[in-house]
């Protein structure tokens, strides 16, 4: 059995095969997922697993150099938005590498998901609780 935090085989395989600047979307239960993009559906029930828990686990296994967030997230769901920003700051502190934060409209965010290697769907039911992670390098 795998010893590290992440034990989901699909997500683990995805992270292991990421190249520099590849993107992964982590989304709430309602975000539309393009047909041609791999869907990794973790949603079990409303709120399970949560968005932030999923972000934490994926951050623990991958090097991220940037994120894309919908502008609406900060205004409509500020508690979750601020918690995400805190997680990103902590990750940056642990790795010693900056994480660029870019905001786009929700409509542009949905279009951008089509570039993701995969979309990881959570059970989160908080509006706009979505993030696109951009892979960095560990060296």
From Swiss-Prot:
Coiled coil residues, start to end: none
InterPro entries membership: D-ribose_pyranase (IPR023064), RbsD-like_sf (IPR023750), RbsD_FucU (IPR007721)
Keyword Lipid biosynthesis: no
Major place of residence: cytoplasm
SUPFAM superfamilies: RbsD-like (SSF102546)
Enzyme kind, highest EC tier: isomerase
Residues engaged in binding substrate: 28, 106, 128-130
Enzyme Commission designation: 5.4.99.62
Subunit and interaction comment: Homodecamer.
Protein name: D-ribose pyranase
Source organism (scientific name): Vibrio campbellii (strain ATCC BAA-1116)
């Amino acid at each position: 059995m795998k010893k590290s935090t992440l034990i989901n085989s699909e997500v683990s395989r995805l992270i292991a095969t990421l190249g520099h600047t590849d993107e992964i979307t982590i989304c709430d239960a309602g975000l539309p997922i393009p047909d041609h993009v791999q869907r990794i559906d973790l949603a079990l029930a409303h709120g399970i697993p949560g968005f932030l828990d999923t972000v934490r686990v994926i951050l623990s296994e991958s090097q991220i150099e940037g994120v894309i967030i919908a502008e609406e997230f900060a205004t409509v769901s500020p508690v979750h938005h601020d918690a995400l920003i805190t997680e990103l700051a902590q990750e940056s502190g642990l790795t010693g590498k900056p994480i660029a934060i870019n905001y786009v409209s929700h409509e542009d965010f949905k279009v951008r998901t089509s570039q993701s290697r995969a979309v990881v769907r959570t059970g989160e039911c908080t509006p706009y609780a979505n993030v696109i992670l951009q892979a960095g390098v560990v060296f």
